[in-house]
């Protein structure tokens, strides 16, 4: 019996109890949940449903809890149901009902935890989208890890996810990048408002290798050559770094194409039709205040040049024409103002603003020996994705960046995350998987096979705790996906790894010496196989490897 199964039983039982006592069963919440008590002595699961219902149906919550407990204890699979406090019900599950979870996990394999919650939904997930003016910095690296994990997570719930990178190759930053490349190619210092770092000199040299006569071209041709070739080279490097980090995209959209293809003009024309556009002081404005923004936004500046939001409008319209039900934008800490702006843009274009979700990520800091690490050899001023991977590896980097809620700034201690110790969270989880893999190999050598035929023998409290936790995995994924919080998966895995290590220390899995393999060994091996599967599934969602040996 999984937590989801128990919740369904609880809801059905509560409906019957309410009807039996002449109370309104319509008061039942759409979703009924059970929780694991912090203190195991209070039971396997607990519910506050009677407290939720008491006032709504005009019943004393504790009395209602008593009726509910009496009805539940009569159900198959419920060993005990006790009333606690003002109206809580603590539940204990019969081992025979609980232990079937082990067989369910083994049968489902790599699909365990998946659901059809988002079947039929087409989701556009745009993340990283860094300017092609330098390597991916540490903030963008956080999005590369979290965005990829979120895409995997949404896919487990049935969504069709398209990962998209919006290539910001339009605007003043590209001009500054071009000027920096030309200066480096000429052996001159970087412009005051330009970009520094050895990567600029490297790309300038590559431009000259591809176009040896670039510096002799007329000025306009020279600039266009360095711009076009340099941007492509930089973006190739960005894509290579992301690929090696385990993050790939389905679609790359060029911002410049929004302007050159006429899609910006089309979006503005559509807004004129709806009356959402007006002119003032020689500029073209969008009435975003009509849709919740704090001020109207300039779309076309007084000099005739499009403002940044013009591209955003065209881009959103382009996404909706491609048939996405939901567009998720993952932006940096300095983009809070974009939330209302993007939602207002969607509404102005005649769409539901709830089809737009904006996630804002906070800063990432690196620490070594208690001191902040601020300088990159490659980029000159910022820490890059490649710097982080060089320091602690892909697995540790991804895990460290995913492990905390994106709205929380994080410090990454390079010494901790590169250590082979239980204090290193990714090592702790991966070691559990490696330990389980070694156990499976040793069992094979002894001729002992996992078997679910005698799961009723799993009665040790550490076995029960481990089984209940692997039963939580589908609910963890469902919650993490609905809240867009993949960090919940990593925290769950750490908790599960802890339960496994404690089980292993308390329950001998394999026969020793001349001991004959028995049904309990086979049942415990099945529990280990299920635990190993859940850890592998969870690490896969995070894009982190599940090593067989460590």
Swiss-Prot record:
BP GO terms, sorted: arginyl-tRNA aminoacylation
Molecular function terms from GO: arginine-tRNA ligase activity; ATP binding
Residue positions of motif 'HIGH' region: 130-140
Swiss-Prot/TrEMBL catalytic activity: tRNA(Arg) + L-arginine + ATP = L-arginyl-tRNA(Arg) + AMP + diphosphate
Nucleotide-binding found in the keyword field: yes
Gene3D superfamilies tied to this protein: Arginyl tRNA synthetase N-terminal domain (3.30.1360.70), HUPs (3.40.50.620), Isoleucyl-tRNA Synthetase, Domain 1 (1.10.730.10)
Keyword flag Coiled coil: no
InterPro entries: aa-tRNA-synth_I_CS (IPR001412), Arg-tRNA-ligase (IPR001278), Arg-tRNA-synth_N (IPR005148), Arg-tRNA-synth_N_sf (IPR036695), ArgRS_core (IPR035684), DALR_anticod-bd (IPR008909), Rossmann-like_a/b/a_fold (IPR014729), tRNAsynth_Ia_anticodon-bd (IPR009080)
Record keywords, A-Z: Aminoacyl-tRNA synthetase, ATP-binding, Cytoplasm, Ligase, Nucleotide-binding, Protein biosynthesis
Cellular component aspect of the GO annotation: cytoplasm
Localisation per UniProt entry: Cytoplasm
EC number: 6.1.1.19
Top-level EC class as recorded in UniProt: ligase
CDD domains: Anticodon_Ia_Arg, ArgRS_core
Pfam family, one: DALR_1
PROSITE patterns named among the record's database cross-references: AA_TRNA_LIGASE_I (PS00178)
Similarity section: Belongs to the class-I aminoacyl-tRNA synthetase family.
Classification via HAMAP family: Arg_tRNA_synth (MF_00123)
Record text on subunit structure and interactions: Monomer.
Name of this chain's protein: Arginine--tRNA ligase
Annotated gene: argS
């Amino acid at each position: 019996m999984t937590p989801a199964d128990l919740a369904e039983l609880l809801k059905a039982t509560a409906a019957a109890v309410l009807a039996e006592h002449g109370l309104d069963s319509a008061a039942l919440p759409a979703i009924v949940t059970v929780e694991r008590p912090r203190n195991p002595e209070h039971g396997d699961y607990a519910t506050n449903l009677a407290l939720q219902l008491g006032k709504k149906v005009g019943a004393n919550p504790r009395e209602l809890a008593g009726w509910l407990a009496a009805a539940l204890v009569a159900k198959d699979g419920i060993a005990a149901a006790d009333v606690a406090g003002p109206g809580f019900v603590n539940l204990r599950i019969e081992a025979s009902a609980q232990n079937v979870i082990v067989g369910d996990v083994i049968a489902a394999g790599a699909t365990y935890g998946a659901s059809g919650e988002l079947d039929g939904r087409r989701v556009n997930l745009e993340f990283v989208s860094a300017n092609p003016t330098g390597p991916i910095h540490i903030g963008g690296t956080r999005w590369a890890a979290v965005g990829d994990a979120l895409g995997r997570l949404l896919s487990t719930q049935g969504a069709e996810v398209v990962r998209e990178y919006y290539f910001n190759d339009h605007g003043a930053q590209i001009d500054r990048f071009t000027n920096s490349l030309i200066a480096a190619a000429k052996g001159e210092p970087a412009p005051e408002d330009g970009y520094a770092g050895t990567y600029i000199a490297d790309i300038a040299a590559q431009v000259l290798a591809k176009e040896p006569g670039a510096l002799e071209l007329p000025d306009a041709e020279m600039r266009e050559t360095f711009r076009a070739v340099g941007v492509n080279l930089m973006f190739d490097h960005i894509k290579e770094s992301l690929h090696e980090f385990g993050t790939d995209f389905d679609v790359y959209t060029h911002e410049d194409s929004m302007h050159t293809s006429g899609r910006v003009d089309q979006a503005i024309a559509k807004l004129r039709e709806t009356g959402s556009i007006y002119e003032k002081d020689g500029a073209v404005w969008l009435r975003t205040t009509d849709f919740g923004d704090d001020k109207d936004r300039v779309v076309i500046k007084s000099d005739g040049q499009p403002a940044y939001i013009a591209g955003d409008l065209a881009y959103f319209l382009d996404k909706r024409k491609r048939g996405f039900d939901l567009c998720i934008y993952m932006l940096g800490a300095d983009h809070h103002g974009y939330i209302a702006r993007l939602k207002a843009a969607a509404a102005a274009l005649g769409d539901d603003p709830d089809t737009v979700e904006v996630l804002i990520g906070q800063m990432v800091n690196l620490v070594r020996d208690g001191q902040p690490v601020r300088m990159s050899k490659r980029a000159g001023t910022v820490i890059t994705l490649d710097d982080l991977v060089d320091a602690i590896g892909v697995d540790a980097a991804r895990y460290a960046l995913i492990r905390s809620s994106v709205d929380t700034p994080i410090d990454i201690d390079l010494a901790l995350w590169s250590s082979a110790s239980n204090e290193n969270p990714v090592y702790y989880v991966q070691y559990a998987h490696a330990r389980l893999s070694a156990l499976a190999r040793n069992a094979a050598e002894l001729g002992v096979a996992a078997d679910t035929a005698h799961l009723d023998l799993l009665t040790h409290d550490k076995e029960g705790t481990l089984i209940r936790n692997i039963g939580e995995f589908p609910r963890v994924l469902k919650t993490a996906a609905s809240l867009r919080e993949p960090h919940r998966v990593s925290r769950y895995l750490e908790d599960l790894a802890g339960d496994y290590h404690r089980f292993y220390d308390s329950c001998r899995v394999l026969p020793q010496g001349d001991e004959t393999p028995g049904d309990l060994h086979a049942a415990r091996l099945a529990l280990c196989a299920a635990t190993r599967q859940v850890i592998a599934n969870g690490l896969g969602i995070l894009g982190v490897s599940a090593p067989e040996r460590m």
